[in-house]
Amino acid sequence: MSGAPEGGRPEDLSRRLAQVRSRISAASHAASSSEPRLIVVTKYFPASDVRILAGLGVSDVGENRGQEAAAKAAELEDLSLAWHFIGQLQSNKARSVVRYARSVHSVDRVSLVTALGKAVAAEQERRAGAGSEPRPDLDCYLQFSLHPDGTADGRGGALPADAAGLAEKVAGTAGLRLAGVMAVAPVDASPDEAFARLLMISASVRAVDPSATGVSAGMSGDLEAAVAAGATHLRIGSDVLGPRPAVG
């Protein structure tokens, strides 16, 4: 049996989170930059872990499985958490995601932008009919492939050449806010070189909207490289939560 001893999960998460925060602080100091925002990716882990993390000061949670994320967000609605959807998103799932997500980090095609815009409009109508507060505009991070040969890969993402057009589509869609860019460093490439490419893409996006300064980059294995490159958001899972539980 793996994981923390019985009754020791809060201590285990506290220790792991402190180690990650220390790495982020050291990397930021080395880069002479402000610390990026930590998004803890809780895919496959229970809502009870998220509640513990919230008690430890975590305010941003990332998920990439829509049904799992929706269930956790509903169970934890008493907490002030910002939910970030970071997985590849089918257009027909947009309506469910905008019910709980503050942002989507995987916007990679015009058809998805259209679907998200319609979903936000429908969600605003639903909330108005229920007498609820309107939701804020949905923050959209444009995901790009950083494959060295300039092609798309299995991790999703638009091609860099499509940056301006995709950014203009988001900027022109009511209910959406162009927040910045996102990418996953290719497994067969230097993260430093990959994130340098992402910064060049970010410049193209900021040419459309100068306020789109977000750079969502860096995971457990390459957060130092991401911080050095100027990431504003880090998506960290296993180094905070430990090995993924077995999934049946």
What are the residue ranges of the model-derived segments?
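Conserved alpha/beta-domain cores
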Residues: 2-221, 227-229, 241-243
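Nucleotide-sugar donor-binding patch of glycosyltransferase catalytic domains
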Residues: 247
